[in-house]
Every structure is written in C-alpha cells, then in structure tokens.
C-alpha cells in the first residue's frame, strides 16, 4: 500500500480526507498516467459511482480533472464497480473510474481506477500517480480552446452491462422466488431489472437509496435482514450485495447464510463437472474455511491460497490462468466473464445452478461442512513480530497436535490496525473458542501493550 492508495484505490472520509481537491488531482494525474501519456490526444474515460450523497461532488471534481488533461469523459451514473470494469474493457476505453467505498459507511468514499484491460492498477501505476500527487505543480499538458472536450452522459451503459450478464446463463429463472437486497447501493435498481428480465419472481429489500442509507443494516454485511425476508415471503433463496456490487452473500430457503466459500464451492463443483474449471483449481484466501478445502479435496478439485484481499486472488488467477476464485466475504471472481469480483454475475450463475440442478440452495450448500470458527483480536506493541515469537509458536504447535487434523489455526498481523488476529477452526464451537482463547492469552501475555 502507498501513501494514498490502499488495497482498493484511494479511500477516506468524503470532504475531509477524500476532498474534491484530491479528486480533481486524481482525475488529472490518473488520466495522464493511464491514458494521455500513451499518445492519445483525447482518451475515452468512463466514470461511475454508487449512491452515496458525496458521490456527485467527487464525480464533478474528478471529471474536471480528467477533462483538464484532455480526456473525453463518459458519465455512467450509478452503476456497480464490476459494471465499470466490464464496460471499460468492452468499449475499449483508455480508463475506467469508480467512485465508491464499497461496504463502508456512508461518510466514507473512494476512487478506484481500471486500466483499458478492465483490471485494477498495478503497484507501479499507483506509484506513478502518487509521485505526481506529491509534486507541487507537475508540468502536465493543459489543452485550451477547441482542444477541451465535452463530457457526455452514457447511462445506457448499465443496460449494456445487464444484457451481457443475462447472456452468461442458458436458462431463465421462471419458477424461482428470490429476495434481492441491494444494500441501498449500486445494485438497487440493477438487481431487480436483471432477475426480473430472467423471469424470476422477485421481492426486494435495501433497494431504496436516499444517498444516506447505503449499507445501513442491509446488504452483504448484514444478511440477517435478508434471512428474515426469505422466511417471511417463503422464497427459494435470497441474494445480498454490498454497496458497490462486487460482493454477494446468499441465504437459503431456511434462512441460513451461504457465504462466499459455499458459493464458490457450488459454482466450482458445477464448472468441474462440466470440465470448465481451468486447472481444476479454485483460488481463495487464507481466511477460507477448512470445510471448504476438505469439500474440494473430496471432489478432486485443487485449491490455492493467497493473502487476504481480492486483488491478491486476481493476481494469482492471472498468473495461473485460473477462472474461479474469491473470498469468504463474497468477492467471487469468474474470470471467463469479468476481471473483478462481481456480485450480480455470481448471483445469476448461482441461480442457474439451482435451477438446472433442481435442488434447493440448502441441499447444494450442505455438501460443504463449515467448521466452527472463533476469531480474537489482540492489541500488541509490534504486530509483525508474532511469527518469530517462540512462545506463540509453541502454543500453536500444541493446539495443532491436539486437533489432530480436525481444525486449523491462522495467526496474522492486521493489515490496518496494531492487532494480531487469532483465528481457529475446530470440530465444535466450544473447541474453536477454547483453542483460540489459549493462543490469544499467550499473544497478549508475551506481546501485549504492556510488554
């Protein structure tokens, strides 16, 4: 991570950390690095946003910065992050930009870039933009007169994206009753249109954005509301998206949550059966449940683990030419169809498996037995020394021996806070909690703030 760019673009409290002034600079410098300096006089740039009240303010500043470098901007309006990624590649734009802070609260916002290939930026590209941000007044081109280009609205882009998503499945969803939770964000209108066009009987919650209620007790980070709605409406299943539509969490007909691991397993199993799973491999992160790996092993499907973060999943998928990967949190990447996590795409693929199999979502999900998980955060003086602490390693070895293959331990430094995260999966809830606490006690005793 750099000074401005985190693992998913530039984020901060809107109008405090992510100001219009910074948005203008990101537009100007990002447009120069990723488009103008490649020789295009008027590179095409697509700009989308989620439903946050600060989105229009930042959008105006960003577009001004892009136009100041000579870009031809097409404003997509409210659309999902994967929608921007898809359209950037499909329309051969030089650059795509999404204004969103994903699943974060309404006060936050963010700006993320996509290259002409639809992928997020490389570290080198982000560093080049950061170097310009740190200069007082970089000497960059300033078109004048007839060389300044109008921006245009291209709200039809969302429909183009939805038409593409419909084309990725071979069946309609007639006979399926589905509850959709748009997190009062980017998918609030997209999801009902998509599943309605595919002839599903839909109910909606979290699809009435007012600029302030994005992710508020709804969406993929609060699936309990969706579970209630599925039971109340006697629906076949429910799908919850996050604020910018790159995550999905499902709920089965019994109101039980079906997370990203289970969704990956269900879709991966179908792809494997149809000989469509590249390398017979699914890429996940170290946070995926032990039950996920055991279920894959039973099916004869291989797995590859990365660090936490969808960008690392995508990097590994590109390296090995794999076409399915994701995170327990619901970032699912189906590389045959899009370059980034796509909640709507994953949703139609999951619904397609349910429709074609004739099985309920609970039946499909039950093939993967989730191990109970316990997570404890310990505040420490130096989180990066946990791997070399002999006392921590000793207790981890002791616990692993006791679990005898029926559990998993993950002890790692937090990426954003002075914490060590202790995660244990075991055969029972009691075992997971007991083992996690025994490790956390040693971490706190040997590495805590008073040490």
UniProtKB/Swiss-Prot annotation:
GO biological process: carbohydrate metabolic process; peptidoglycan biosynthetic process; UDP-N-acetylglucosamine biosynthetic process
Gene3D superfamilies attached to this UniProt entry: Alpha-D-Glucose-1,6-Bisphosphate, subunit A, domain 3, Alpha-D-phosphohexomutase, C-terminal domain
Alphabetized SUPFAM superfamilies for the sequence: Phosphoglucomutase, C-terminal domain, Phosphoglucomutase, first 3 domains
EC number: 5.4.2.10
Keyword Amino-acid biosynthesis: no
Cofactor annotation remark: Binds 1 Mg(2+) ion per subunit.
Listed cofactors: Mg(2+)
UniProt: Mg(2+) binding residues: 102, 242, 244, 246
UniProt PTM: Activated by phosphorylation.
Similarity-based family: Belongs to the phosphohexose mutase family.
Entries under PANTHER family matching the protein: PHOSPHOGLUCOMUTASE (ALPHA-D-GLUCOSE-1,6-BISPHOSPHATE-DEPENDENT) (PTHR42946:SF1), PHOSPHOHEXOSE MUTASE (PTHR42946)
Family annotation (HAMAP family): GlmM_B (MF_01554_B)
Cross-referenced NCBIfam families: glmM (TIGR01455), PRK10887.1 (NF008139)
Name of the molecule in the record: Phosphoglucosamine mutase
Name of the encoding gene: glmM
């Amino acid at each position: 991570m750099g000074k401005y760019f985190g693992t998913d673009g530039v984020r901060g409290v809107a109008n405090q950390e992510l100001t219009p002034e910074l948005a203008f600079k990101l537009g100007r410098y990002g447009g120069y690095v990723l488009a103008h300096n490649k020789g295009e006089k008027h590179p095409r740039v697509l700009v989308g946003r989620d439903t946050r009240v600060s989105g229009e303010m930042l959008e105006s500043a960003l577009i001004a910065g892009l136009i100041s470098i000579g870009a031809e901007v097409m404003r997509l309006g409210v659309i999902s992050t994967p929608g921007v990624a898809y359209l950037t590649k499909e329309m051969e734009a030089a650059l795509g930009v999404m204004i969103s802070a994903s699943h974060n609260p309404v006060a936050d916002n963010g700006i993320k870039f996509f290259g002409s290939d639809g992928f997020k930026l490389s570290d080198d590209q982000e560093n080049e933009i950061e170097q310009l941000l740190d200069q007082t007044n970089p000497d960059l081109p300033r078109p004048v007169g007839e060389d300044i280009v109008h921006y245009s609205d291209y709200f039809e882009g969302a429909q183009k994206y939805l038409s593409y998503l419909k084309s990725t499945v071979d069946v309609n969803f007639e006979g399926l009753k589905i509850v959709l939770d748009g997190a009062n964000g980017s998918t609030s209108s997209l999801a009902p249109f998509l599943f309605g066009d595919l002839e599903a009987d839909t109910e909606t919650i979290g699809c009435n954005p007012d600029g302030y209620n994005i992710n508020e007790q709804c969406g993929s980070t609060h699936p309990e509301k969706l579970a209630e709605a599925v039971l109340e409406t006697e629906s076949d299943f429910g799908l919850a998206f996050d604020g910018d539509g790159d995550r999905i969490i499902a709920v089965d007909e019994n109101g039980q949550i079906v997370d990203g691991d289970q969704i990956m397993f269900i879709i991966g199993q179908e792809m494997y059966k149809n000989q469509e799973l590249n390398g017979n491999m699914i890429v996940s992160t170290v946070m995926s449940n032990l039950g996920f790996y055991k279920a894959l092993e039973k099916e004869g499907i291989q797995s590859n683990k990365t660090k936490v973060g969808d960008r690392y999943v995508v990097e590994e998928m590109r390296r090995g030419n794999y076409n399915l990967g994701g995170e327990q949190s619901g970032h699912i990447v189906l590389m045959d169809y899009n370059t980034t996590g796509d909640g709507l795409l994953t949703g139609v693929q999951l619904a397609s498996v349910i429709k074609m199999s004739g099985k309920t979502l609970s039946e499909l999900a039950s093939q993967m037995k989730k191990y109970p998980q316990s997570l404890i955060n310990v505040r420490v003086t130096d989180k990066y020394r946990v791997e070399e602490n002999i006392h921590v390693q000793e207790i981890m070895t002791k616990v692993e021996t006791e679990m005898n293959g029926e559990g998993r331990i993950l002890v790692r430094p937090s990426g954003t806070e002075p914490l060590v995260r202790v995660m244990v999966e075991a055969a029972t809830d009691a075992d997971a909690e007991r083992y996690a606490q025994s490790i956390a006690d040693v971490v706190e005793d040997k590495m805590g703030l008073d040490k």
